[in-house]
Structures are given as C-alpha cells and as structure tokens.
Amino acid sequence: MLRQNRGAGAIAADVMTGVRPEAETGNSVPTAIAVTSADLVLPPTDQQTPTAALLQAPDVQALEMAIGDMHVLLEQHGYVVAVYPTGISPAHERRLYSVRSVLESDRIALVKVDLPPLGVAVLVRQLRQLSICDFSPGVVASAARLLTHYIHAGALLHSVTKFDRVPVDLRTHAKSWVPGSQFAVVAGPEPQLVRVGPKADPPTGPEFATHLMTAKGQSQSEWVKETLAPAWQVQSIHESALPSESPAWWGTGKLVEFAAYLPDISVLYQLVSSVRRENCRWCRMELIGDRCGFCSSPLPAAEHRMHTAGVLSHEALAPPQS
C-alpha cells in the first residue's frame, strides 16, 4: 500500500511514468470494478467472481487518500471501471473526476448508470463476472450500457406522491392517498406504472428467463414474490438488503425493490460477444455499442452495428431437464 505522506503529485507521476502492471504485460489480471457505495456490492455468484473496490465520498475520505487508493487499483489491475448511479451527490461525482484528472490516467472509466439502486448493484455484479472473462477493459466498460437494457428494475411502492422517476398522472397521485394503495413501477428498460389490485395485470416483464433479486424496505407485502415472479416466469428468487439510496430514489421507504436479470455468466458472455467490436477513434480503446466506455466518445452512426438478435429466450436459460 502507499504511504500516507506521499503527495498527490508524486502518485500521479508514478501512474504516468511507472511500469505498467501485469494486466498490460500479457498476464491475466481482471479489470477492477469499483463502486461508490458498499451496498452496491452483492454477494458473488461463485468463488471466481471478484469483489468490487469502494470509492468513498469526499466527506469520508480525503482527496489524497482517494488518489492513493485509485493508484493502487491501477497498479494491481491495469484498468478500473468505476460504476456509479445517477443519484449520487454532485460532490461525490466531482471527486471521481478529480481523481482521474489528477492522475491524468486514460485507464479509468467512469460509467454513470441510470438505474434504481438495486438494479445498479445487479449490473455491477454482472460486470464483476465479465471482468474475469477474456474481454478487454474497453469491452467490459461499454458492456454496462448494453446490459442495462436486460435488467428489468422496479419496485412495489405504497405511495407515488413523491416519486418523479416515471411520469405519474394526477389521477394516480390522488389514488396514492387512499389507504392500502400499492403501485408496481418498472423504471427500465421501459417505464411502467400500474396500480396493484386483484384484477390488475402486473407490469410487462422480460421475454427471456431471469432470476429476480428483491430487497424489502418498510413494506411487508409479498406481492413481488407471489404475483410478479410467477407472471415474469423467473427461475429463482433471491433476497438482498435494501440499498441505502433506495428510499430517496423511489420517494418512499415503504417499498419492495426488485430487479430481474440474467444470472448465467455463459449467457452474459454470449450476449456481449455477439456485439460487433470497434476501436474508439479518440482513445483507441476497444468498445461495443455506440459509445466508448473510457472517454465517452460516440462511435459514428455508420459504424454502430448490433448483432444480439436470437441470443436470449426463455428456452436459452431454461434449467436442464432431468
């Protein structure tokens, strides 16, 4: 580890002039995945899935220490993909950019994700799984945007009076004042909001087989497990602690957050592999999709080709027949 009395300038000089780590000399070292909150790190799915590094907020860690921690990650892994939600504080987001600026490193990707907190945690774990595959750091970073389209993230809410992430009409707002009212909201990939009731259909779910992650707040409702999960034909249900940012994100603490996702690393690998790879014209990093995960430079439209059709289906993830 770095000694605490080393200045930020000395650390930055090490990054710019020092010998690059094993990840860039031919040996296999996973790309580091980093997060801005510890509760975005779900338990690993297997013994091979690495954990994620924590990039702490400015009110918790001094800038020089944050620079030192990032320098260690770069030394150990070569590249860092930092994933953070849209809901973090402006000061925390500025800290991420400050650290990258001081280090003057082109090996740090800052990936901002517009998903609810539990959805972000699910995405982070998928990236952790992919980090040990034979994908370049650029592909891992740009895979985040691809995978968000395959995470159906939402919540069961007891009120939508303070919820502003999905358009809510006045009639629905009025109904939320009725005692016992509950609403099922899907924030992405396609926004949906329905009032929960005996005759109401659940929101439209994924057209491929998934697992379902749930996290309870101050709600004891079993609707997600008893109604939504069967309707979405999920293969397995898992429970997690509610992320600390979830009540603020959803506008209420009386909720059950959920996220349907692809659990199988082989399917994730196939999905990412099915997309055409390009080299960023600006930083030369490898990428998939329409934007570089490291420098955010867009790919010219004529070069953006997706080839994911036919990769996913309920049958593709169905459990083997005994």
Q: Language-model segments: which ranges?
A:
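Cys/His-clustered metal-coordination modules, chiefly Zn-binding fingers
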Residues: 214-322
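Domain-scale terminal segments
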Residues: 1-223
